[in-house]
Amino acid sequence: MSFLFFSKPSLSEVQHLVNLETGISILDVFQMSYAEWHGGQISPFSIGRFHYKPVWEASYIQRDESEIVFDPGVVFGSGWHVTTITCLEALERIFQQENISSAIDLGTGSGLLALATAKYGCQRVLAVDLNPLAVSTTWFNIRENGLESRIMPCQAKAEDNVGIPAELLMANIHYDVLQRIVALEEFYLKKWFILSGILRSQFFELRELFRTRPVHIEEVWNEGQVWYTILGKIVS
């Protein structure tokens, strides 16, 4: 399944393109609002020491250091999904304990985790996504927050970037990709990790795997026994 996004009504143009091809026709039309696409209205929220605001509600005249502004565009990352919220809470836990100087955000979406990590003081953050729309959206949000010197967006497969040296690895991503990530020895060279996008049965699979590896699970979030987020540390 594929989606095309338009900034204005475009049915006539689409119909014209369809008419140029044989064997193709429009079967149905469903109009979805921007809020429906994201699963609800996008509004400000606060987690830990930061306030997250969509760009259309942020002040360009007076921003304080606790503000992170973002535009999710049409990619995942409105901030309201429970996996995003719990990942941000996990980040707060890490930075309450120590400073992190390098991090990788795999499946960055709109870049919220990367933005927060850099705002906490992390000097080098690699924000990776296979979706080019996510990369361009993240780059926009990086510039909006003046974090160009700290975050580098990259279009690539998540598992191809696990080997890049970093103290922290974050991955809020499909479970099939997570499985490939944790199967790599390079994963266990990190100091901290945050994994999310995990369902109940998948969490138990990961927990059993980590019992055989040098991993200490610091905290687990399991909102409604549906979505799980794991904050873990590699034991050297």
Protein language model regions, located:
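N-terminal auxiliary segments of SAM/dcSAM-dependent transferases
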Residues: 1-61
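Short beta-strand micro-motifs in enzyme catalytic cores
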Residues: 2, 66, 226-230
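Hydrophobic anchor at the start of a short beta-strand
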Residues: 24-27, 125, 215-218
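A short helix-to-beta-strand connector/capping loop
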Residues: 24-25, 48, 64, 123, ...
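SAM-dependent Rossmann-like transferase core, predominantly class I methyltransferases
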Residues: 37-97
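Conserved SAM/SAH cofactor-binding pocket of Class I
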Residues: 78-158
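S-adenosylmethionine
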Residues: 130-234
